[in-house]
Amino acid sequence: MPSLSSKTSTMQRSCRPQMSACPNQQQKDRPVPQLSCVLCRDRKLKCDKLDPCSNCTSSGVACTPIYRPRLPRGRHARTVQTKASTPPDTRRRGSSNESTTAPAPDDGGLGTHIDQLDNLVQDREVSKLGLSGEGNGLQELISLVSDETMPATAWSTHCFGTISRILSSRIRRLESLVQETARIQTPKRARKPMTPVVVQWYSAPLAGCNWNRMVVQTPQGLEVQQFPAPPTSYSARRSPELSGNDIWADLMDHDMHDPPQYNALELPPDLTNEGGVDNMGSSGRDDPINNGFNALRLLGINNSLSPSFISLPRDRLSASKLCQVYLQNVDPIIKILHRPSLSRWMVDGAPTYLGSSEDDYAVKALESAVCYTAANTMTEHQCQAAFQKTKSSIMAVRRKMCEDALENAGLLTTRDMTVLQAFILYLVTPTDLSKIGRRSEDKDTAVWALVALAIRLIKAMGLNQEPSEGARKGESFFQQQLRLRLWLTACLIDLQASFAQATDPLITHRDAACAVPYVANINDSDFDVDTAHPVASHEELTDTTFALVTYRVQVAGRLFNFGPGCSTAAERHKLAQEVQQQVFTLLHYCDPESSSYAWFTWHSTQSIIFAVRLSELLPFRCGQPGGHVPPPSPRAEGDTTLLWRALQNLEKAQLIRADPRGDGFRWYITTPWLALSTAISECNSCTDVALVCRAWPVIEISYRQHEELQISDECQLPQGPLVHLMNKTREKLAPLLQEGGARLSDSQTVDRASADSLQPPVPVGSIPIDPLLTNGSLGADTAMSEASSIGSLPPFEQQCWKQMTMPTDGAPVRDGVVFTSELYNPLQSDFLNSHG
């Protein structure tokens, strides 16, 4: 019996399968088990795992079996998680029970790299290795993880989730230590760049899994790499500076519509307001994130789904180029910054701006706004030559950076006028109708509400106080001039928003008028931060002349359209005469041939005055009960005054667009909607065939510019009253123009003699507005002006009237508004050619 037992034991041992030398290979050869079908799993029934199973057969539904390895459960699942976090020697000494669990993914040495990083953190080796070596280790690890995780299968992805969470946590610990060590080893405000370093996380789907993209700074520039998403919000880190055009190629690689998942930003604790000049009357810059909230996202400014660019490196060279464009194209028109101070900081490379470091969030917001505004004024050819990128791509990036910078500057809680200056620049930037800007893109209440926000913030900071009150509080001349310029620019865009939405302005006529006399007609080089006494105004053309023209006209525009003091035609005519006298006094010594800015100021001012004279006869009406402005008086039959004044405005706008001296300012010139609609309506009812024949080519050109802009922007032309009125007038005038010999079919010309004859007779007893204006007529130019307007200007038939990058400014024509001389809703401030 013992021998039988021994023999049986020997047979049992011989029947046992031999232990495989490679357990992993044996597990791989094992067939994939069949699990409960989909219906039984959802209904929580026991499945017999037939094909089809009995439950599905009895229910009469299709059976969908599931074939995959079983997921570890209970203590086995905990064992897999523990194995991923234990040291390598512990993993190699795994127990026999662990061998029965699901096999861990082959990390290809990933655990070794994790352990190395963990040891660096624990032993504080970062201070010994230096920032460069630590960054290289981090870059190597990220590249390894990216290579290892890309071909992950559905099963390995589940197991890798545990590893990725642990890895993400340790990388964040490592980066925090690197950041802390950098602050300890490097003096304040003089840190050395980290090379390379993670810049920003981005969410993006990849291979059915939830992965993230991140922008990594490498010696070759910014690169987008894949990495598993961290479980918590990631703090953006500052990155080294770039120069040249390296940033553009990498910024546009990612999808602009990937939804962001991590928006929290960690601000460096040492970004505080340094000493020096508090140029904005600020009481100190607090942490905008801790004291406020993400105001812009709530207000709809950051309404795109693109990720944040706030942590991307500062491109000094690109910023310098765009600042030069701003100083040339924008600063002469929107005069809210001190030109020499801005040039020293962004062009010459000064470390501070008016005593504030370039790391200050308010200064960053101003830089982003300057670049965004400047990029808008460039043509497509200029963008390609300077940055090798399209204008739309540059504008998309610059707009996003501007919005994020304003958000992080704490717009709603700021006490710094620099942030408000940046916000105003953001609001006045016009861009393509169908693409990216705020003012021209959003024709609803969005910009209208944001303008109201800007006005409230300015009032909350006391920037609207009268100059006498500021003097009593010890306000310097420098502070006063910048404050008044900002306030009057806000008054300007407030008037524009009122026209756009057919509402009353928020700023009263008195609040706007009291500040105008205190703005000096001087150059920015005449004063600086240390100027102790006021500087007297000049008689000649200065940096502020054109801005003063717009300030004075917008004050008159409030009286014309919203004030109760101009209810009669005589009062309105008197006000128009006063405005003309004030404006042309500023241009008394302006030589249009001296510079492009002088040429533009001269002709643009005349265009503004023509719009004022037209608005004298056609006041703006909100269409609300109790409006201040009465309907226009009935006109005599055959009166062509409206048509004359509308044509003067249209012709002057065409002249500015056609002459090469207006290239840098074309972003500012828009289609005068009031003049265009009035001219079309008057031609439809005018009986003077000769006048209509001379006027119609100008009307066709102006209307075609608007139409071509809509086509170039790939947006449908709104079929509103203006379109119907234009088609109706064309049909009516077609036989009349042919009989009158207008030659419209042969060329789109306007004879200069005819153009000169488009001046209505001067009323008897009229007082000349300015000695430079021949015979006292506002429409007649001097010999000097005439030479500037036609000396180098080819005839109309040789001009290409295609509107290049100049957007049409004006709210869309709304249903129910008839564009006639009796009832017209201008929707824009045609006093200023609508450039707010």
Swiss-Prot record:
Region Disordered, annotated ranges: 1-29, 72-114
Gene Ontology terms: cellular component: nucleus
UniProt xrefs under Gene3D superfamilies: Zn(2)-C6 fungal-type DNA-binding domain
Localization (cell): Nucleus
Biotechnology: Viridicatumtoxin and its derivative, viridicatumtoxin B, exhibit anti-methicillin-resistant Staphylococcus aureus (anti-MRSA) activity. Moreover, viridicatumtoxin and a C2 acetyl analog, spirohexaline, have been demonstrated to inhibit bacterial undecaprenyl diphosphate synthase, a potential new target for antibiotic development.
Pfam families from the UniProt entry: Fungal_trans, Zn_clus
SMART domains referenced in this protein's UniProt entry, alphabetically: Fungal_trans, GAL4
GO BP, sorted A to Z: DNA-templated transcription
Biased composition (Polar residues): 1-26, 79-88
Entry keyword annotation includes Transcription: yes
Keywords: DNA-binding, Metal-binding, Nucleus, Transcription, Transcription regulation, Zinc
Binding region for DNA: 37-63
InterPro entries: Sec_Metabolite_Reg (IPR050613), Transcription_factor_dom_fun (IPR007219), Zn2-C6_fun-type_DNA-bd_sf (IPR036864), Zn2Cys6_DnaBD (IPR001138)
Recorded superkingdom: Eukaryota
A Gene Ontology molecular function term of the record: DNA-binding transcription factor activity, RNA polymerase II-specific
Function (record text): Probable transcription factor that regulates expression of the gene cluster that mediates the biosynthesis of viridicatumtoxin, a tetracycline-like fungal meroterpenoid with a unique, fused spirobicyclic ring system.
Protein name, entry field: Transcription factor vrtR2
GN (gene name): vrtR2
